[in-house]
Amino acid sequence: MGDSLTLEGKAQLITRNLQELLGEDKMKEILKERPLRIYWGTATTGKPHVAYFVPMSKIADFLKAGCEVTILFADLHAYLDNMKAPWDLLELRTRYYEQVIQAMLQSIGVPLERLRFIRGTEFQLSKEYTLDVYRLSSVVTQHDAKKAGAEVVKQVEHPLLSGLLYPGLQALDEEYLKVDAQFGGVDQRKIFTFAEKYLPALGYAKRIHLMNPMVPGLTGAKMSSSEEESKIDLLDSPADVKKKLKKAFCEPGNVENNGVLSFVRHVLFPLKSEFVVLRDEKFGGNKTYTDFETLEKDFAEELVHPGDLKASVEKALNKLLHPIREKFNSPEMKKLSNDAYPDASKQKSVPKGSTKNSGTEEIDPSLLDLRVGKILSVSQHPDADSLYVESVDVGEANPRCVVSGLVQYVPSDQLLGRSVVLLCNLKPQKMRGIESQGMLLCASTEGEQKQVEPLDPPSGSAPGERIYIEGYENGEPEGELKPKKKVFEKLQVDFRISDDLCAQWKGKNFLTKLGSVTCKTLRGGSIG
Protein backbone atom coordinates (compact mmCIF):
# COMPACT_ATOMS: atom_id res chain seq x y z
CA MET A 1 0.00 0.00 0.00
CA GLY A 2 2.85 2.39 0.84
CA ASP A 3 4.12 2.44 -2.77
CA SER A 4 0.74 3.64 -4.10
CA LEU A 5 0.44 6.54 -1.66
CA THR A 6 1.46 10.11 -2.41
CA LEU A 7 3.99 11.86 -0.19
CA GLU A 8 1.16 13.67 1.58
CA GLY A 9 -0.78 10.43 1.95
CA LYS A 10 2.19 8.75 3.64
CA ALA A 11 2.76 11.73 5.93
CA GLN A 12 -0.93 11.78 6.87
CA LEU A 13 -0.90 8.09 7.80
CA ILE A 14 2.31 8.43 9.80
CA THR A 15 1.10 11.45 11.77
CA ARG A 16 -2.63 10.83 12.31
CA ASN A 17 -3.69 10.73 15.96
CA LEU A 18 -0.24 11.83 17.13
CA GLN A 19 -0.09 14.46 19.85
CA GLU A 20 3.25 15.86 18.74
CA LEU A 21 5.88 15.51 16.02
CA LEU A 22 9.44 16.85 16.26
CA GLY A 23 11.21 17.03 12.88
CA GLU A 24 8.35 17.08 10.38
CA ASP A 25 10.35 18.78 7.61
CA LYS A 26 13.13 16.21 7.90
CA MET A 27 10.56 13.40 7.78
CA LYS A 28 9.08 14.70 4.52
CA GLU A 29 12.53 15.08 2.96
CA ILE A 30 13.31 11.42 3.73
CA LEU A 31 9.91 10.26 2.42
CA LYS A 32 10.72 11.87 -0.94
CA GLU A 33 13.75 9.57 -1.27
CA ARG A 34 13.00 6.30 0.57
CA PRO A 35 10.91 4.60 3.29
CA LEU A 36 11.15 6.12 6.77
CA ARG A 37 12.91 3.88 9.33
CA ILE A 38 11.12 3.99 12.71
CA TYR A 39 11.56 2.17 15.98
CA TRP A 40 9.26 1.68 18.94
CA GLY A 41 10.69 0.40 22.19
CA THR A 42 9.00 -1.09 25.22
CA ALA A 43 10.67 -1.85 28.55
CA THR A 44 9.75 -5.39 29.61
CA THR A 45 8.33 -4.53 33.05
CA GLY A 46 4.67 -5.00 34.09
CA LYS A 47 2.18 -6.95 31.99
CA PRO A 48 1.11 -5.11 28.84
CA HIS A 49 -2.52 -3.93 28.93
CA VAL A 50 -5.10 -2.77 26.39
CA ALA A 51 -3.57 0.73 26.09
CA TYR A 52 -0.73 -0.99 24.20
CA PHE A 53 -3.17 -1.23 21.30
CA VAL A 54 -2.55 2.51 20.79
CA PRO A 55 1.09 2.06 19.64
CA MET A 56 0.09 -1.17 17.87
CA SER A 57 -2.46 0.70 15.76
CA LYS A 58 0.18 3.32 14.91
CA ILE A 59 2.64 0.59 13.92
CA ALA A 60 -0.07 -0.63 11.53
CA ASP A 61 -0.25 2.93 10.13
CA PHE A 62 3.54 3.07 9.70
CA LEU A 63 3.54 -0.17 7.72
CA LYS A 64 0.65 1.04 5.52
CA ALA A 65 2.76 4.13 4.80
CA GLY A 66 5.62 1.89 3.65
CA CYS A 67 7.87 2.53 6.67
CA GLU A 68 10.50 0.07 7.90
CA VAL A 69 9.61 -0.64 11.53
CA THR A 70 11.75 -2.09 14.34
CA ILE A 71 10.29 -3.18 17.68
CA LEU A 72 12.79 -3.09 20.54
CA PHE A 73 12.19 -5.19 23.65
CA ALA A 74 14.17 -3.01 26.05
CA ASP A 75 15.12 -5.66 28.60
CA LEU A 76 18.14 -3.82 30.00
CA HIS A 77 16.01 -0.68 30.46
CA ALA A 78 13.50 -2.72 32.49
CA TYR A 79 16.27 -3.62 34.92
CA LEU A 80 17.74 -0.10 35.07
CA ASP A 81 14.35 1.44 35.94
CA ASN A 82 14.55 0.79 39.69
CA MET A 83 14.70 -2.94 38.93
CA LYS A 84 11.06 -3.09 37.80
CA ALA A 85 12.11 -6.37 36.23
CA PRO A 86 14.45 -8.28 38.61
CA TRP A 87 17.50 -9.76 36.90
CA ASP A 88 16.35 -13.34 37.53
CA LEU A 89 13.02 -12.62 35.77
CA LEU A 90 14.40 -10.51 32.92
CA GLU A 91 14.65 -13.32 30.36
CA LEU A 92 11.18 -14.66 31.20
CA ARG A 93 9.51 -11.25 31.01
CA THR A 94 11.20 -10.47 27.72
CA ARG A 95 9.90 -13.75 26.27
CA TYR A 96 6.43 -12.91 27.61
CA TYR A 97 6.54 -9.47 25.95
CA GLU A 98 7.70 -10.99 22.66
CA GLN A 99 4.80 -13.43 22.64
CA VAL A 100 2.06 -11.04 23.78
CA ILE A 101 3.12 -8.11 21.54
CA GLN A 102 3.23 -10.40 18.52
CA ALA A 103 -0.21 -11.77 19.45
CA MET A 104 -1.56 -8.20 19.69
CA LEU A 105 -0.18 -7.31 16.28
CA GLN A 106 -1.68 -10.45 14.75
CA SER A 107 -5.07 -9.70 16.33
CA ILE A 108 -5.24 -6.38 14.43
CA GLY A 109 -3.97 -7.91 11.18
CA VAL A 110 -0.36 -6.65 11.15
CA PRO A 111 1.95 -8.94 9.11
CA LEU A 112 4.81 -9.91 11.46
CA GLU A 113 7.16 -10.68 8.56
CA ARG A 114 7.31 -6.96 7.76
CA LEU A 115 8.62 -6.11 11.22
CA ARG A 116 12.08 -6.41 12.77
CA PHE A 117 12.17 -7.58 16.40
CA ILE A 118 15.25 -7.13 18.59
CA ARG A 119 16.20 -7.27 22.28
CA GLY A 120 18.23 -4.49 23.84
CA THR A 121 20.84 -6.85 25.25
CA GLU A 122 21.59 -8.09 21.72
CA PHE A 123 23.56 -4.89 21.07
CA GLN A 124 23.64 -2.82 24.28
CA LEU A 125 26.35 -4.98 25.87
CA SER A 126 28.75 -4.66 22.93
CA LYS A 127 32.15 -2.99 23.31
CA GLU A 128 31.20 -0.12 20.97
CA TYR A 129 27.89 0.63 22.67
CA THR A 130 29.44 0.49 26.15
CA LEU A 131 32.16 2.93 25.09
CA ASP A 132 29.47 5.31 23.83
CA VAL A 133 27.69 5.08 27.19
CA TYR A 134 30.92 6.29 28.83
CA ARG A 135 31.38 9.00 26.19
CA LEU A 136 27.84 10.21 26.76
CA SER A 137 28.28 10.22 30.54
CA SER A 138 31.21 12.60 30.12
CA VAL A 139 29.03 15.32 28.54
CA VAL A 140 25.62 14.83 30.19
CA THR A 141 24.91 16.67 33.43
CA GLN A 142 23.23 14.93 36.35
CA HIS A 143 20.46 17.54 36.17
CA ASP A 144 19.69 16.80 32.51
CA ALA A 145 19.75 13.02 33.03
CA LYS A 146 17.35 13.23 35.97
CA LYS A 147 15.05 15.67 34.17
CA ALA A 148 14.94 13.50 31.03
CA GLY A 149 13.72 10.45 32.92
CA ALA A 150 11.29 12.27 35.21
CA GLU A 151 8.14 11.12 33.36
CA VAL A 152 9.32 7.58 32.62
CA VAL A 153 11.77 6.32 35.24
CA LYS A 154 10.21 5.49 38.61
CA GLN A 155 10.76 8.44 40.95
CA VAL A 156 11.98 7.55 44.44
CA GLU A 157 13.37 9.51 47.38
CA HIS A 158 16.91 8.21 46.85
CA PRO A 159 17.28 7.60 43.08
CA LEU A 160 19.72 4.99 41.85
CA LEU A 161 22.47 5.74 39.34
CA SER A 162 20.83 3.21 36.98
CA GLY A 163 17.84 5.53 36.51
CA LEU A 164 20.18 8.33 35.40
CA LEU A 165 21.74 6.05 32.78
CA TYR A 166 18.34 5.10 31.34
CA PRO A 167 17.74 8.19 29.11
CA GLY A 168 21.25 7.99 27.65
CA LEU A 169 20.79 4.38 26.60
CA GLN A 170 17.46 5.20 24.97
CA ALA A 171 19.14 8.01 23.03
CA LEU A 172 21.98 5.74 21.86
CA ASP A 173 19.46 3.13 20.70
CA GLU A 174 18.45 5.52 17.90
CA GLU A 175 21.99 5.40 16.49
CA TYR A 176 22.63 1.69 17.01
CA LEU A 177 19.31 0.66 15.49
CA LYS A 178 20.12 2.87 12.45
CA VAL A 179 16.70 4.52 12.37
CA ASP A 180 15.44 7.92 11.23
CA ALA A 181 12.78 8.25 13.91
CA GLN A 182 11.70 7.04 17.32
CA PHE A 183 8.03 6.61 18.21
CA GLY A 184 6.63 6.63 21.75
CA GLY A 185 4.13 8.14 24.14
CA VAL A 186 4.16 11.85 24.90
CA ASP A 187 5.46 10.89 28.36
CA GLN A 188 8.77 10.17 26.57
CA ARG A 189 9.12 13.75 25.33
CA LYS A 190 11.87 14.76 27.76
CA ILE A 191 13.94 11.73 26.75
CA PHE A 192 13.39 12.58 23.08
CA THR A 193 14.57 16.18 23.50
CA PHE A 194 17.49 14.87 25.60
CA ALA A 195 18.48 12.68 22.64
CA GLU A 196 18.17 15.62 20.23
CA LYS A 197 20.52 17.64 22.43
CA TYR A 198 23.18 15.05 23.20
CA LEU A 199 23.48 12.69 20.20
CA PRO A 200 25.07 15.47 18.08
CA ALA A 201 27.63 15.92 20.88
CA LEU A 202 28.88 12.42 20.01
CA GLY A 203 28.83 13.15 16.29
CA TYR A 204 25.52 11.37 15.64
CA ALA A 205 22.52 12.77 13.78
CA LYS A 206 19.47 14.18 15.52
CA ARG A 207 16.44 11.96 14.94
CA ILE A 208 12.74 12.59 14.30
CA HIS A 209 10.37 11.97 17.22
CA LEU A 210 6.74 10.90 16.95
CA MET A 211 4.52 10.98 20.05
CA ASN A 212 1.08 9.52 20.66
CA PRO A 213 -1.12 10.81 23.51
CA MET A 214 -1.37 8.86 26.75
CA VAL A 215 -4.72 7.09 26.98
CA PRO A 216 -6.51 7.75 30.28
CA GLY A 217 -7.02 4.70 32.45
CA LEU A 218 -10.43 3.48 33.52
CA THR A 219 -10.32 5.80 36.53
CA GLY A 220 -9.44 8.90 34.49
CA ALA A 221 -5.67 8.98 35.15
CA LYS A 222 -2.95 7.54 32.91
CA MET A 223 -3.39 3.81 32.31
CA SER A 224 -0.58 1.99 34.11
CA SER A 225 0.69 -1.60 34.31
CA SER A 226 1.31 -1.14 38.03
CA GLU A 227 -2.23 0.05 38.86
CA GLU A 228 -4.63 -2.87 38.61
CA GLU A 229 -7.87 -0.89 38.74
CA SER A 230 -6.81 1.56 36.02
CA LYS A 231 -6.33 -0.96 33.23
CA ILE A 232 -7.66 -4.02 31.44
CA ASP A 233 -5.07 -6.77 31.09
CA LEU A 234 -4.70 -8.45 27.70
CA LEU A 235 -5.53 -11.81 29.28
CA ASP A 236 -8.52 -10.64 31.31
CA SER A 237 -11.60 -12.82 30.83
CA PRO A 238 -14.77 -11.41 29.21
CA ALA A 239 -16.29 -11.28 32.72
CA ASP A 240 -13.32 -9.24 34.00
CA VAL A 241 -13.57 -6.87 31.03
CA LYS A 242 -17.27 -6.32 31.74
CA LYS A 243 -16.61 -5.75 35.46
CA LYS A 244 -13.79 -3.24 34.88
CA LEU A 245 -15.66 -1.33 32.18
CA LYS A 246 -18.74 -1.15 34.39
CA LYS A 247 -16.65 0.59 37.08
CA ALA A 248 -14.82 2.82 34.57
CA PHE A 249 -15.08 6.60 34.83
CA CYS A 250 -17.47 7.61 32.03
CA GLU A 251 -19.63 10.47 33.28
CA PRO A 252 -22.55 11.52 31.04
CA GLY A 253 -21.48 14.39 28.80
CA ASN A 254 -17.90 14.46 30.12
CA VAL A 255 -15.39 13.92 27.30
CA GLU A 256 -12.30 14.89 29.35
CA ASN A 257 -10.14 12.16 30.93
CA ASN A 258 -12.63 9.60 29.63
CA GLY A 259 -10.65 6.38 29.12
CA VAL A 260 -13.54 4.57 27.42
CA LEU A 261 -14.02 7.31 24.83
CA SER A 262 -10.24 7.66 24.32
CA PHE A 263 -9.92 3.95 23.56
CA VAL A 264 -12.49 4.33 20.78
CA ARG A 265 -10.59 7.29 19.36
CA HIS A 266 -7.05 5.94 19.44
CA VAL A 267 -7.61 2.22 18.85
CA LEU A 268 -10.98 1.22 17.46
CA PHE A 269 -11.44 3.99 14.87
CA PRO A 270 -7.92 3.72 13.37
CA LEU A 271 -8.32 -0.06 13.05
CA LYS A 272 -11.85 -0.23 11.64
CA SER A 273 -12.62 3.31 10.38
CA GLU A 274 -16.02 3.02 12.04
CA PHE A 275 -17.60 2.27 15.39
CA VAL A 276 -21.05 0.89 16.13
CA VAL A 277 -22.87 2.01 19.28
CA LEU A 278 -25.15 -0.84 20.33
CA ARG A 279 -28.58 0.32 21.51
CA ASP A 280 -31.98 -1.21 22.15
CA GLU A 281 -34.50 -0.57 19.37
CA LYS A 282 -36.69 1.44 21.75
CA PHE A 283 -33.80 3.89 22.16
CA GLY A 284 -33.26 4.24 18.42
CA GLY A 285 -31.35 1.04 17.66
CA ASN A 286 -27.69 0.66 16.73
CA LYS A 287 -25.89 3.69 15.32
CA THR A 288 -22.76 3.54 13.15
CA TYR A 289 -20.20 6.34 13.40
CA THR A 290 -17.63 6.86 10.65
CA ASP A 291 -15.66 9.58 12.43
CA PHE A 292 -14.75 10.08 16.07
CA GLU A 293 -15.66 13.76 16.19
CA THR A 294 -19.36 13.03 15.63
CA LEU A 295 -19.34 10.35 18.34
CA GLU A 296 -17.60 12.71 20.77
CA LYS A 297 -20.12 15.47 20.01
CA ASP A 298 -23.08 13.13 20.55
CA PHE A 299 -21.60 11.88 23.83
CA ALA A 300 -20.97 15.45 25.02
CA GLU A 301 -24.60 16.29 24.25
CA GLU A 302 -25.72 13.07 26.01
CA LEU A 303 -27.17 11.55 22.84
CA VAL A 304 -24.98 8.50 23.59
CA HIS A 305 -25.47 6.93 27.02
CA PRO A 306 -22.34 5.80 28.95
CA GLY A 307 -23.88 2.34 29.41
CA ASP A 308 -24.33 1.92 25.64
CA LEU A 309 -20.80 3.20 24.97
CA LYS A 310 -19.31 0.77 27.50
CA ALA A 311 -21.27 -2.19 26.11
CA SER A 312 -20.14 -1.35 22.57
CA VAL A 313 -16.48 -1.00 23.60
CA GLU A 314 -16.77 -4.26 25.55
CA LYS A 315 -17.87 -6.15 22.44
CA ALA A 316 -15.18 -4.62 20.20
CA LEU A 317 -12.46 -5.11 22.81
CA ASN A 318 -13.32 -8.76 23.43
CA LYS A 319 -13.05 -9.33 19.67
CA LEU A 320 -9.48 -7.96 19.78
CA LEU A 321 -8.56 -9.92 22.90
CA HIS A 322 -9.99 -13.28 21.82
CA PRO A 323 -7.00 -14.44 19.69
CA ILE A 324 -4.59 -13.31 22.43
CA ARG A 325 -6.48 -15.30 25.07
CA GLU A 326 -6.51 -18.30 22.74
CA LYS A 327 -2.75 -18.17 22.25
CA PHE A 328 -2.08 -17.91 25.99
CA ASN A 329 -4.48 -20.74 26.82
CA SER A 330 -1.87 -23.36 25.93
CA PRO A 331 0.02 -25.04 28.82
CA GLU A 332 3.31 -23.60 27.54
CA MET A 333 2.05 -20.01 27.48
CA LYS A 334 0.29 -20.36 30.85
CA LYS A 335 3.58 -21.52 32.37
CA LEU A 336 5.47 -18.61 30.79
CA SER A 337 2.93 -16.13 32.18
CA ASN A 338 3.08 -17.62 35.67
CA ASP A 339 6.88 -17.84 35.68
CA ALA A 340 7.40 -14.30 34.37
CA TYR A 341 4.91 -12.80 36.82
CA PRO A 342 4.88 -15.03 39.90
CA ASP A 343 2.20 -14.44 42.52
CA ALA A 344 3.78 -11.99 44.96
CA SER A 345 1.73 -13.34 47.87
CA LYS A 346 3.35 -16.73 47.36
CA GLN A 347 6.84 -15.27 47.17
CA LYS A 348 6.82 -13.24 50.38
CA SER A 349 6.33 -14.64 53.86
CA VAL A 350 4.36 -12.72 56.47
CA PRO A 351 6.74 -11.00 58.91
CA LYS A 352 6.97 -12.64 62.32
CA GLY A 353 4.38 -11.27 64.71
CA SER A 354 2.33 -9.69 61.93
CA THR A 355 -1.43 -10.16 62.08
CA LYS A 356 -2.09 -8.68 58.66
CA ASN A 357 -3.64 -11.21 56.28
CA SER A 358 -2.93 -11.49 52.57
CA GLY A 359 -6.30 -10.07 51.58
CA THR A 360 -6.98 -6.55 50.39
CA GLU A 361 -6.77 -4.00 53.19
CA GLU A 362 -10.08 -2.19 53.67
CA ILE A 363 -10.01 1.49 52.79
CA ASP A 364 -11.13 3.82 55.57
CA PRO A 365 -14.21 5.79 54.38
CA SER A 366 -13.28 8.67 56.69
CA LEU A 367 -10.65 9.61 54.06
CA LEU A 368 -13.52 11.19 52.10
CA ASP A 369 -14.19 14.84 52.91
CA LEU A 370 -18.00 14.77 52.69
CA ARG A 371 -19.77 17.96 53.69
CA VAL A 372 -23.20 19.53 53.70
CA GLY A 373 -23.43 22.13 50.93
CA LYS A 374 -26.05 24.71 50.02
CA ILE A 375 -26.53 25.61 46.35
CA LEU A 376 -26.47 29.40 46.00
CA SER A 377 -26.82 29.63 42.21
CA VAL A 378 -27.36 27.36 39.21
CA SER A 379 -26.65 28.15 35.56
CA GLN A 380 -26.32 26.26 32.29
CA HIS A 381 -22.75 25.42 31.27
CA PRO A 382 -21.92 27.75 28.33
CA ASP A 383 -20.38 24.93 26.29
CA ALA A 384 -22.38 21.84 27.34
CA ASP A 385 -26.15 21.47 27.22
CA SER A 386 -26.08 18.57 29.71
CA LEU A 387 -24.12 20.33 32.46
CA TYR A 388 -24.99 22.75 35.23
CA VAL A 389 -22.49 25.12 36.85
CA GLU A 390 -23.37 25.59 40.51
CA SER A 391 -22.04 27.86 43.26
CA VAL A 392 -22.08 25.85 46.50
CA ASP A 393 -21.53 27.08 50.06
CA VAL A 394 -19.59 24.46 52.06
CA GLY A 395 -18.73 26.65 55.03
CA GLU A 396 -15.56 28.14 53.54
CA ALA A 397 -14.62 31.78 52.92
CA ASN A 398 -15.85 31.53 49.32
CA PRO A 399 -18.39 29.24 47.62
CA ARG A 400 -17.09 26.38 45.46
CA CYS A 401 -17.73 26.09 41.74
CA VAL A 402 -19.19 22.66 40.96
CA VAL A 403 -20.03 21.24 37.52
CA SER A 404 -22.58 18.41 37.41
CA GLY A 405 -24.38 16.51 34.65
CA LEU A 406 -27.90 16.89 36.04
CA VAL A 407 -29.65 18.96 33.35
CA GLN A 408 -31.67 15.99 32.04
CA TYR A 409 -32.63 14.75 35.48
CA VAL A 410 -33.18 17.64 37.91
CA PRO A 411 -34.72 21.04 37.01
CA SER A 412 -32.56 23.97 38.07
CA ASP A 413 -35.29 25.40 40.31
CA GLN A 414 -35.19 22.17 42.36
CA LEU A 415 -31.47 22.69 42.98
CA LEU A 416 -31.43 26.39 43.83
CA GLY A 417 -31.28 26.86 47.60
CA ARG A 418 -31.16 23.12 48.21
CA SER A 419 -28.94 21.40 50.79
CA VAL A 420 -26.79 18.70 49.18
CA VAL A 421 -23.92 16.31 49.90
CA LEU A 422 -20.61 17.42 48.38
CA LEU A 423 -17.39 15.44 48.11
CA CYS A 424 -14.82 18.17 48.68
CA ASN A 425 -11.38 16.54 48.41
CA LEU A 426 -11.34 15.19 44.87
CA LYS A 427 -8.62 16.73 42.73
CA PRO A 428 -10.21 19.73 40.91
CA GLN A 429 -10.95 18.83 37.30
CA LYS A 430 -11.92 20.90 34.27
CA MET A 431 -15.21 19.92 32.63
CA ARG A 432 -15.61 21.50 29.21
CA GLY A 433 -13.31 24.35 30.25
CA ILE A 434 -14.72 25.11 33.73
CA GLU A 435 -12.93 23.77 36.81
CA SER A 436 -15.16 21.74 39.13
CA GLN A 437 -14.11 21.89 42.78
CA GLY A 438 -16.22 19.06 44.10
CA MET A 439 -18.72 16.31 43.29
CA LEU A 440 -22.40 16.59 44.12
CA LEU A 441 -23.44 13.10 45.27
CA CYS A 442 -26.66 11.69 43.83
CA ALA A 443 -28.58 8.44 43.91
CA SER A 444 -29.46 6.86 40.57
CA THR A 445 -31.25 3.85 39.14
CA GLU A 446 -30.86 2.37 35.65
CA GLY A 447 -33.78 1.11 33.61
CA GLU A 448 -35.92 2.15 30.65
CA GLN A 449 -35.51 5.68 31.95
CA LYS A 450 -32.60 6.57 34.20
CA GLN A 451 -33.60 8.36 37.40
CA VAL A 452 -31.31 10.63 39.42
CA GLU A 453 -31.90 12.38 42.76
CA PRO A 454 -29.43 14.43 44.83
CA LEU A 455 -28.82 13.08 48.33
CA ASP A 456 -30.51 15.00 51.16
CA PRO A 457 -28.69 15.88 54.41
CA PRO A 458 -30.87 15.93 57.54
CA SER A 459 -33.16 18.97 57.80
CA GLY A 460 -31.46 21.84 59.61
CA SER A 461 -27.89 20.83 58.65
CA ALA A 462 -25.56 23.80 58.18
CA PRO A 463 -23.26 24.33 55.16
CA GLY A 464 -19.81 22.88 55.86
CA GLU A 465 -21.06 20.37 58.43
CA ARG A 466 -19.09 17.12 58.25
CA ILE A 467 -20.77 13.96 56.94
CA TYR A 468 -19.25 10.67 58.05
CA ILE A 469 -19.92 6.94 57.81
CA GLU A 470 -21.44 5.24 60.85
CA GLY A 471 -18.62 3.81 62.99
CA TYR A 472 -15.95 6.00 61.36
CA GLU A 473 -16.69 9.25 63.19
CA ASN A 474 -13.15 9.88 64.42
CA GLY A 475 -11.16 9.50 61.19
CA GLU A 476 -9.63 12.48 59.40
CA PRO A 477 -10.16 13.09 55.66
CA GLU A 478 -7.19 13.51 53.35
CA GLY A 479 -6.44 17.03 52.16
CA GLU A 480 -6.76 15.92 48.53
CA LEU A 481 -7.42 12.37 47.35
CA LYS A 482 -4.58 11.05 45.19
CA PRO A 483 -6.05 9.90 41.84
CA LYS A 484 -3.62 6.96 41.62
CA LYS A 485 -4.94 5.46 44.88
CA LYS A 486 -8.56 5.53 43.61
CA VAL A 487 -9.93 5.84 47.16
CA PHE A 488 -13.34 7.18 46.10
CA GLU A 489 -13.76 4.68 43.26
CA LYS A 490 -13.03 1.72 45.55
CA LEU A 491 -15.40 2.94 48.26
CA GLN A 492 -18.13 3.91 45.77
CA VAL A 493 -18.62 0.28 44.71
CA ASP A 494 -20.35 -0.32 48.07
CA PHE A 495 -22.44 2.88 48.18
CA ARG A 496 -26.18 2.08 48.09
CA ILE A 497 -29.60 3.45 49.02
CA SER A 498 -31.24 1.17 51.61
CA ASP A 499 -34.87 0.01 51.68
CA ASP A 500 -35.63 2.79 54.16
CA LEU A 501 -34.01 5.33 51.77
CA CYS A 502 -30.81 5.93 53.77
CA ALA A 503 -27.48 6.47 52.00
CA GLN A 504 -25.12 3.68 53.09
CA TRP A 505 -21.64 2.22 52.66
CA LYS A 506 -21.57 -1.53 53.32
CA GLY A 507 -24.82 -1.22 55.27
CA LYS A 508 -23.56 1.66 57.44
CA ASN A 509 -25.41 4.99 57.21
CA PHE A 510 -24.05 8.33 56.04
CA LEU A 511 -24.55 10.54 59.11
CA THR A 512 -24.36 14.08 60.42
CA LYS A 513 -24.88 15.10 64.04
CA LEU A 514 -28.58 15.56 63.16
CA GLY A 515 -29.18 12.12 61.66
CA SER A 516 -28.95 10.12 58.44
CA VAL A 517 -28.42 11.29 54.86
CA THR A 518 -31.35 10.13 52.75
CA CYS A 519 -32.80 9.97 49.25
CA LYS A 520 -36.44 10.71 48.38
CA THR A 521 -37.53 7.67 46.33
CA LEU A 522 -34.73 5.60 44.76
CA ARG A 523 -34.60 2.46 46.95
CA GLY A 524 -31.70 0.20 45.99
CA GLY A 525 -30.08 2.92 43.89
CA SER A 526 -26.36 3.40 43.46
CA ILE A 527 -24.58 6.56 44.63
CA GLY A 528 -22.11 8.61 42.65
Swiss-Prot record:
tRNA-binding domain location: 364-468
SUPFAM superfamilies according to UniProt: Nucleic acid-binding proteins, Nucleotidylyl transferase
Residues at which L-tyrosine binds: Y39, Y166, Q170, D173, Q188
A single MF term (Gene Ontology): ATP binding
Motif (Nuclear localization signal): 242-247
Root EC class: ligase
InterPro entries xref list: aa-tRNA-synth_Ic, NA-bd_OB-fold, Rossmann-like_a/b/a_fold, tRNA-bd_dom, Tyr-tRNA-ligase, Tyrosine-tRNA_ligase_regulator
Signal peptide: none
Enzyme Commission designation: 6.1.1.1
Keywords attached to this entry: Aminoacyl-tRNA synthetase, ATP-binding, Cytoplasm, Ligase, Nucleotide-binding, Nucleus, Protein biosynthesis, RNA-binding, tRNA-binding
PROSITE patterns the UniProt entry points to: TRBD
Annotated compartments: Cytoplasm; Nucleus
Segments carrying motif 'HIGH' region: 44-52
A single cellular component GO annotation: cytoplasm
UniProt xrefs under Pfam families: tRNA-synt_1b, tRNA_bind
Catalytic activity: tRNA(Tyr) + L-tyrosine + ATP = L-tyrosyl-tRNA(Tyr) + AMP + diphosphate + H(+)
Region (Disordered): 332-362
Gene Ontology biological process: tyrosyl-tRNA aminoacylation
Domain remark from Swiss-Prot or TrEMBL: The nuclear localization signal, which mediates localization to the nucleus, is also important for interacting with tRNA(Tyr), suggesting that it is sterically blocked when tRNA(Tyr) is bound.
Subunit and interaction comment: Homodimer.
Record PANTHER family: TRNA-AMINOACYLATION COFACTOR ARC1 FAMILY MEMBER, TYROSINE--TRNA LIGASE, CYTOPLASMIC
Role according to the record: Catalyzes the attachment of tyrosine to tRNA(Tyr) in a two-step reaction: tyrosine is first activated by ATP to form Tyr-AMP and then transferred to the acceptor end of tRNA(Tyr).
NCBIfam families: PRK08560.1 (NF006330), tyrS (TIGR00234)
Family: Belongs to the class-I aminoacyl-tRNA synthetase family.
The name this protein goes by in its record: Tyrosine--tRNA ligase, cytoplasmic
Gene: yars1
